[in-house]
């Protein structure tokens, strides 16, 4: 069975995850997998901790897609690619970003961000689809 990329650590308001064509409400402890689309409503926010200790915090009205995530807990090797389709995302990088920042990227509808720091905020405007 596939291991989750991470878990929801904080959830406020209306937050859902779309996985394999099904949409479910999110609560603290909900696993997040590669391919999941996490959405926050206008009253929602969500904090996700990935298995390399990366912290992703999506603000109200956001849509976040986890495109790729791989992390080896023995060697700390891995990669992360996520897309912020709309809204805001605060990021504190974990072990992958600290040891191999070239392996961490975030996309928006208009740009691809390569990471060289450890904390940053991304905003994407648009319809999020």
Q: Which residues fall in each region the model found?
A:
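Flexible, surface-exposed loop/linker segments and immediately adjacent secondary-structure boundaries
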Residues: 1-38, 42-129
């Amino acid at each position: 069975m596939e291991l989750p990329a991470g878990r929801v650590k904080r959830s406020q308001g209306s937050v859902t995850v779309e996985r394999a064509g099904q949409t479910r409400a999110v609560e603290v402890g909900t696993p997040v997998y590669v391919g999941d689309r996490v959405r926050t409503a206008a009253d929602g926010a969500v904090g996700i901790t990935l298995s390399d200790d990366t912290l992703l915090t999506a603000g109200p009205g956001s849509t976040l897609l986890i495109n790729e995530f791989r992390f080896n807990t023995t060697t700390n090797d891995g990669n992360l690619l996520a897309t912020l389709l709309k809204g805001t995302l605060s990021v504190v990088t974990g072990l992958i970003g600290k040891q191999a920042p070239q392996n961490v990227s975030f996309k928006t509808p208009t740009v691809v961000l390569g990471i060289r720091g450890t904390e940053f905020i991304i905003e994407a405007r648009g319809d999020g689809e």
